[in-house]
Amino acid sequence: MALLQISEPGQSPHPHQRRIAVGIDLGTTHSLVAAVRNGVSECLPDAQGRVLLPSVVRYLDQGGRQIGHEAVAAQVWDARNTIASVKRFMGRSLKDVARAGQLPYDFVPDAAAQGMLSLATVAGNKSPVEVSAEILAALRQRAEDSFNADLYGAVITVPAYFDDAQRQATKDAARLAGIPLLRLINEPTAAAIAYGLDNASEGIYAVYDLGGGTFDISILRLAQGVFEVIATGGDSALGGDDYDAALVDWVLQQARRQASTPADRAALRIAARACKQALSATDIAAFSADISCANVHVDVRRADFEAITADLTARSMAAVRRALRDAQLTRDQVQGVVLVGGATRMPQVQRAVAQFFGQPPLTNLNPDEVVALGAAIQAHQLAGNGGNAAELLLLDVIPLSLGVETMGGLVERIVARNEPIPTAKAQDFTTYKDGQTALAIHVVQGERDLVQDCRSLARFELRGIPPMVAGAARIRVTFAIDADGLLSVSAKEQGSGAQAHIDVKPSYGLSDEQIARMLQDSFATAAQDMKTRALVEARVDAERMLSATQSALAADGEMLSARERAAIEALMATLSAQREADDAAVIEAATEALAQGTQAFAARRMNRGIRQALAGRNVQTL
């Protein structure tokens, strides 16, 4: 009979050794899988020793497919069926896809998900979720082959600026790939985990993450194993692909050529990427591509490349400045800058970062691998495998404020941007009209004061509110955001217990323009927004005062003399005329005048109510 081996708690030499947990960096250009082995986080190679898996999937007729390296070459001669950079399409609608006309794909509406896009291939229409699932499945297989065991779970990284739709699409892709998802974490946060544990870093750090398709900047406070993201920013339509596209446009202009077919565009993109990478090591490199029976050959100087892409680098640095402003920090307070993403190898990027912060960026770890390495450490912890990672505390934040619409089209923020997640916040609201039995709740996202300037996330209704006078009901609205950044909203009437709930799963993501514009607009229009909000609030208060006074007159008007009633009605007429004025102070003055003019009436009503409540009662019964 086999004997059980018993160890002291936490002292087993190989606790949970069969829990194979990995970190996956699902990237725009390349994807990686990493795991902690023998206490060290490392990327897992394929059979040929390659750790980078090109994020490319080629669909064949009869249901076949090629994934990764074997699909890369087909981008030139089978561009329509060879899908690259699919991460840029996750959670997006057709109208959200920038430069769709320049891409070699046939975009069609997704029949299964209203508002979403799919890509037409020889194997049928494929959604970005399905394409991403192919890449994830290949990485899962690599991990299981490496350990010769089934996968327990994975932590998958996403850009910090991914919204709810894009995060949900990533979770769906993991499920489709057969991967038990332990958690989604932000890519910059994963990089901080890797650097923090490897170097025992403490203090304020910036993580500058320029990948193939997205740019993220995160400001983090690292102290004694606690990773707190205190500000985030970025651009979901800025990455290495955009540098490639700018180079292609410039080369075609120099060569006086045009890309007339999808195969031409694919060949030019591949040549641009190779030229860009060469220019990181040399001052001049050849751009060479065969298109439409002609060869395009241009010698590109690094200075030329930096000039034509200067605006892209400047866009990233503008986001860095905004993130520091959000964190209420100066660049001098940042102890170090971590570079993430293969695009950060470009000299102009490293130079811009160094000049801005006044110090060279950290490059201890491979920028292509650092995100996967950090995700693997987090997965190791979540799987219960112990080690130093067991003491790690991770605090991500939400990138944009969340709130609800109130009267007058104003936004009442419930969860402020840069709030650490997971979190739950609640706020009490009330009814606006007498006898109101339902409340429409409109959930919005953004930094502006007016609903029309923010992004609508969801709408739902709370019904079954007992009829009562305006302002008597107490409705608690709760926002709960899980560790993956996904939102659920509930509303409950405190007296009756009536409640409603919704999981916010928007049908499409933010457009490229919206993401770049939302924060910029909030700063540029702050003063005007404040003035507009004050005006709307004054009008709402005036309307509420008029409605309450009208109800009081209808219920207890006989308590007033004709002269008193006429005085109140005159004040009401003045307020009614002034409430459409464009000056909040004028409206507030008229509202206050009516409030003062009805004080005696309100006191009489209160006294009558008390007398009626006490009628027939004595001290003992009270």
UniProtKB/Swiss-Prot annotation:
<dbReference type="GO" id="GO:0005524">
    <property type="term" value="F:ATP binding"/>
</dbReference>
<dbReference type="InterPro" id="IPR029048">
    <property type="entry name" value="HSP70_C_sf"/>
</dbReference>
<protein>
    <recommendedName>
        <fullName>Chaperone protein HscA homolog</fullName>
    </recommendedName>
</protein>
<comment type="function">
    <text>Chaperone involved in the maturation of iron-sulfur cluster-containing proteins. Has a low intrinsic ATPase activity which is markedly stimulated by HscB.</text>
</comment>
<keyword id="KW-0067">ATP-binding</keyword>
<dbReference type="GO" id="GO:0140662">
    <property type="term" value="F:ATP-dependent protein folding chaperone"/>
</dbReference>
<keyword id="KW-0547">Nucleotide-binding</keyword>
<dbReference type="GO" id="GO:0016887">
    <property type="term" value="F:ATP hydrolysis activity"/>
</dbReference>
<dbReference type="Pfam" id="PF00012">
    <property type="entry name" value="HSP70"/>
</dbReference>
<comment type="similarity">
    <text>Belongs to the heat shock protein 70 family.</text>
</comment>
<dbReference type="InterPro" id="IPR043129">
    <property type="entry name" value="ATPase_NBD"/>
</dbReference>
<dbReference type="InterPro" id="IPR018181">
    <property type="entry name" value="Heat_shock_70_CS"/>
</dbReference>
<dbReference type="InterPro" id="IPR013126">
    <property type="entry name" value="Hsp_70_fam"/>
</dbReference>
<keyword id="KW-0143">Chaperone</keyword>
<dbReference type="InterPro" id="IPR029047">
    <property type="entry name" value="HSP70_peptide-bd_sf"/>
</dbReference>
<dbReference type="InterPro" id="IPR010236">
    <property type="entry name" value="ISC_FeS_clus_asmbl_HscA"/>
</dbReference>
<dbReference type="GO" id="GO:0051082">
    <property type="term" value="F:unfolded protein binding"/>
</dbReference>
<dbReference type="GO" id="GO:0016226">
    <property type="term" value="P:iron-sulfur cluster assembly"/>
</dbReference>
